[in-house]
Amino acid sequence: MRDALEKKIAESEAAFPKILENLPDRLGYRAEDGTDYYGRVIMAGGEVLVDKVRQRVLYPILEGLQKKYDGRVHIIIQTTGDLVTDEILDELLARNVWLVSVAGMDDYHVGHEGEKRLPVMDRLHALFHSRGMVQMNEYEPVRLSAQTAHTWYNMFGATEDAWIGKLWPRGRAWLNGLTTATLDDNFCNAWSGGLSFLNHGEAGSEVSIEPDGKVYPCCLKTAAPLGDLTQEKLIDMLDALRAEPALQAINSGDPAAMGENYGWSREHFIERASAKMPNGIVCNNLCLGCDAFFGDVLGPVLEKSARVRLDRSA
């Protein structure tokens, strides 16, 4: 485990300067009323506050974002909260962090089951308030207004009434048979899904960037990447892929349509959107159809497209 962590950290250290270089010169979006807002960078996945990750990867990235955008970007740290101390919070705020988002406030995280999470939440509330931070859920209209001087925090978890309550068919939720997602749960057509990922410069456009620079249209991550941010600029990548019908289907939140130009009917996509979890229970979800289509068809198409783009720029 220690060797795997060191390998991932070294990979991130090598990749992040190029990733920062290939991000857009301006990160922002325009709302429906025509108002321009800062864009957001969410640092999440695993636990970004682990000492080695925080010191060797997270802090240099935060400092690089500050240098590139001069504060004109909203930086969000997502953490389970266990490692948020007075010292670490001060270090984050000093590096222009705008929101600390505490995930894992649910029964799936050890030590947070039921009322066990209440003391954890009380400690975090007190810590955040001591730094003048405002709980985002309490002042949602302020969050959407012009840039404010506030720093924010929120807490959430995979509870039944939450948007992630069904659990994505990924990771431990898949390995442990915890996902209850069905074909009615379209993760693509939602926040953190592929919806509007191609529409850069507009509200809701979002991509997922791995530590090695691989880019995906959603947080769940498709079975193959769109491209590599250590090798090309993000906007160039998205613009080059804009005409791909399968990606347009993801962009519109309609993944079952992604194979229609490749001989995959909606009916066939639904047939392939089924797999048996390690515990023997069959899961039926659109993400599984997406995995199958990427594996059989779209993965090689995207790989070829990336090679062509890189050859042209060589």
Feature map (PLM): residue ranges:
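Conserved glycine-rich "GG(E/T)P / GGGxP" loop and the immediately following alpha-helix
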Residues: 1-159
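A C-terminal junction/extension of Radical SAM enzymes
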Residues: 126-221, 259-277
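Flexible mid-to-C-terminal extensions adjoining Fe-S/redox cofactors in radical SAM and related proteins
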Residues: 220-314
